[in-house]
Amino acid sequence: MRGRLILIGMPASGKTTIGAALARALSVPLYDADALTEQTVGCSIPEIFAAEGEAAFRALERRTLEALCTETETPCVIATGGGAVLTEQNRELLRRSGTVFWLDRPVDNIMSTDYAAGRPLLAGGEAALRALYAVRCPLYAACAHYRVPDGTVDQMKDYILRLWRDTP
């Protein structure tokens, strides 16, 4: 097995949960970009947004992604933040640093989860989430090597593992 298995997708799409299942199945480490960013600055992402704004958070996120894509041992699983694909620089970094899987979870399914609560960019409700989805979908598609359709954690994990194992 080789390289980094990188997960992208909307906030609350299951990147960390599915990443953990993949890491267990592959017996490799999981690196959660949002958790590492929080650990680095010593406060939560909502606190960073409230105190410093989205631009400051995106700069921190970029530094975290650079570290994960250059300093982590491979193989590993990396769960990115939902906005990791917002800049061309980040998309290029992710694509050249591993195999990128887009967890394409529909808005209705994201809204139905408890873990959507407390996420700064999901605070605007369903209309805001649909607008965010419309903007980000083309960016996820441009960054991903593979699109992963929605399903249970096990279904999505197994789908990714089949693709991962078949990729040269």
Tell me the role of every PLM-derived stretch.
Residues 2, 17, 21, 25, ...:
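NTP-dependent small-molecule kinase module
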Residues 7:
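Hydrophobic anchor at the beta1->P-loop junction of P-loop NTPases
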Residues 10:
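P-loop (Walker A) phosphate-binding loop of NTP-binding proteins
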Residues 14:
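Conserved glycine(s) of the Walker
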Residues 24-35:
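Post-Walker A helix-loop "phosphate-sensing" segment adjacent to the P-loop in P-loop NTPases
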Residues 33-92, 139:
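ATP-dependent small-molecule kinase phosphotransfer cores
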Residues 81-84, 106-108, 153:
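Short glycine-rich anion-binding loops that position phosphate/pyrophosphate groups of nucleotides
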Residues 96-137:
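A glycine- and Lys/Arg-enriched "phosphate-lid" helix/loop adjacent to the NTP-binding pocket
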